[in-house]
Amino acid sequence: RLNKYMPRLTMHKRFSKGEPTFHLAVEFSAPKLLFDSNFDELVEADFESLVTALQEKLFELVGSRFSKRQLAEADIGTWHPSKNIIFLDYTSCQTVLNTISKLDFSRVYDLQKTDFRDGHVVHVHGNSLDIAFYDKLADLRQAKKSEKRAIEKDSYLQLNLLDQLEEYRPIEVFRYEVRFVGRASVKRAYPELDKWTFETMFKRKLCQAGL
């Protein structure tokens, strides 16, 4: 395991008119790609730096240098807009999660509450999306014991932040993610777009609309 954040790559082989074609799927967290952490949130002005970072990491992984235009125009197959909400007033993430878990989502979603050993996450599952609410600091504490217990992947990169954040007590970090999985789901979520590429979707208003 590298001591830095790297994208996950999957090569898909398909056949078109009897000929094989290959498509590289690239999965990554945009803030982790730039900052090794998703406590910091990106703005539209970060796009150029993000594409440059992605270009360099892909070169490191596969030995091929994709152009920045290729990366900017890459089709989006999965999209996870998210938001960190910081509480400094003794508001407890657990209280918020308990309230959310009591809401009636049944008319729209199937609600499933998943408890991990020393913390909680609420998942709202639908046919075309997945919504996750969780206590980010509790999730990091779980990752410190075992990454398998944590909801976030690659949490080991952020473990050093736990001690730093303790200085800001009573800090609580509530994370909210909406996960559109599959290109059809992304298109349904943003029907106003003509194309669903990395560049066209990296917009604040689109992320806010998804949340």
Predicted regions, residues:
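Structured, helix-rich domain cores that form ligand/interaction pockets
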Residues: 1-211
